[in-house]
Amino acid sequence: MELKVTTLEGKEAGSVQLSDEIFGLEPRSDIIQRCVIWQLAKRQAGTHKAKGRAEVWRTGKKMYKQKGTGGARHGSQRVPQFRGGGRAFGPVVRSHAIDLPKKVRVLALRHALSAKAKGGGLIVLDKAELEAAKTKTLVGHFSGLGLESALIIDGAEVNNGFAAAARNIPNIDVLPVQGINVYDILRRKKLVLTKAAVDALEARFK
């Protein structure tokens, strides 16, 4: 697959040959979905907690005698049916993470990249660098490229000036190539790869 390379100013800067094994697959939504669920489950803190009947601070003394009152038989006041009692089957601190084989995660990333390429949402930049770290300048460049919602992937290191200028622009994310992931690819309309990112991805998936 051949794709033209553009500059930040919107000018053509040649073309690049993309591997069909990475960008030319027929996207499988089931594999992509499994990876997204895995990512979102893993990022949950799992710190929610409610006290059960053994943990609430309240007397455990029997409320009243067993017989002779005409009332229902009750023991501890910590039981869930009373106000101030413990919660029945409440949330506890736990990990929400699920297992997903590494091969499936790698395959899902390939399918996500292929989905962007097939849908026309993939752009290749020659480089993501700015002479002066000015957000206003970068907004103008993005407007010319039609980038309202985009994930920008650079090489192993992101240019500090570019990252600083893009930081306050809504719906724009900038990541190094080692941070690329399925969820962030899908949540933005466009995927922008620099030539360095393309080379790194093809070396990674060899």
From Swiss-Prot:
One of the primary rRNA binding proteins, this protein initially binds near the 5'-end of the 23S rRNA. It is important during the early stages of 50S assembly. It makes multiple contacts with different domains of the 23S rRNA in the assembled 50S subunit and ribosome. Forms part of the polypeptide exit tunnel. NCBIfam families: rplD_bact. Belongs to the universal ribosomal protein uL4 family. Keywords: Ribonucleoprotein, Ribosomal protein, RNA-binding, rRNA-binding. It holds the Pfam family Ribosomal_L4. The lineage of its organism: Bacteria, Pseudomonadati, Pseudomonadota, Alphaproteobacteria, Hyphomicrobiales. Part of the 50S ribosomal subunit. The keyword RNA-binding applies. Gene3D superfamilies: 3.40.1370.10. The keyword Transcription does not apply. This is Large ribosomal subunit protein uL4. One of its GO terms (biological process) is translation. GO terms for molecular function: rRNA binding; structural constituent of ribosome. The gene is rplD. GO terms for cellular component: ribonucleoprotein complex; ribosome.
